[in-house]
C-alpha cells in the first residue's frame, strides 16, 4: 500500500527512505511492514503516522513498538500535516507508556495516543524536525 501523500511529502523533506528493492533487507522489511509508513532515517527505524481528525489521535501497535524496543533507538513521528507534528525517540515513547499517558487498548493491541502532546516533541516544519531531532542545520525559517 503506497504511503499517504502527506507522509510521503514529509519523509522526502527529511530524507527518510525505505530499503531499495533487491537490497538485503527489502524482503524482510516488506514481510514485517504491510503499510508504507515505516522508514529509515539517519540509521534509525522511523514510524510515521498521520491523523486526519479535528482532534488528532493515533494508534500505534504494541507489537511494532515491542519489536523496535530491541533496537538501540528509533523515531515515532505523529503528523497532523505534511509539515507539522510530534516526534518521539525510543526513550520518549517508553516514558509516555510507563506514565500511562499512552494507554494500551487490549482489544486491538494498539496504544491510543491523544492530544495534547508534549511541546518539547513538537515541530512545525520538516526543517525544524531535522534541526531539533537530527541535529541538522538548515537556512530555512522554522
Language model feature labels by segment:
Residues 2-5, 91-142:
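Non-catalytic C-terminal interaction segments of nucleic acid-processing enzymes
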Residues 4-15, 65, 69, 94, ...:
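Generic detector of well-ordered alpha-helical segments enriched in charged/polar residues
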Residues 12-21, 70-75, 98-102:
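Structural alpha-beta junctions
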Residues 41-42, 79-81, 105, 135:
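Compositionally biased amphipathic helical and low-complexity segments enriched in hydrophobic
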Amino acid at each position: 500500500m503506497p504511503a499517504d501523500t502527506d507522509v510521503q511529502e514529509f519523509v522526502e523533506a527529511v530524507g527518510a527512505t525505505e530499503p531499495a528493492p533487491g537490497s538485503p533487507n527489502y524482503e524482510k522489511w516488506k514481510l514485517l511492514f504491510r503499510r508504507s509508513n515505516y522508514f529509515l532515517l539517519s540509521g534509525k527505524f522511523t514510524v510515521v503516522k498521520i491523523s486526519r481528525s479535528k482532534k488528532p489521535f493515533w494508534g500505534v501497535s504494541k507489537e511494532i513498538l515491542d519489536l523496535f524496543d530491541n533496537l538501540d533507538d528509533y523515531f515515532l513521528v505523529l503528523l497532523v500535516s505534511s509539515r507539522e507534528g510530534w516526534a518521539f525517540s525510543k526513550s520518549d515513547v517508553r516514558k509516555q507508556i510507563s506514565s500511562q499517558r499512552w494507554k494500551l487498548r487490549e482489544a486491538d493491541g494498539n496504544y491510543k495516543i491523544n492530544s495534547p502532546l508534549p511541546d518539547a516533541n513538537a515541530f512545525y516544519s520538516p526543517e525544524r524536525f531535522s534541526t531539533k531531532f537530527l541535529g541538522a542545520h538548515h537556512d530555512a525559517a522554522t
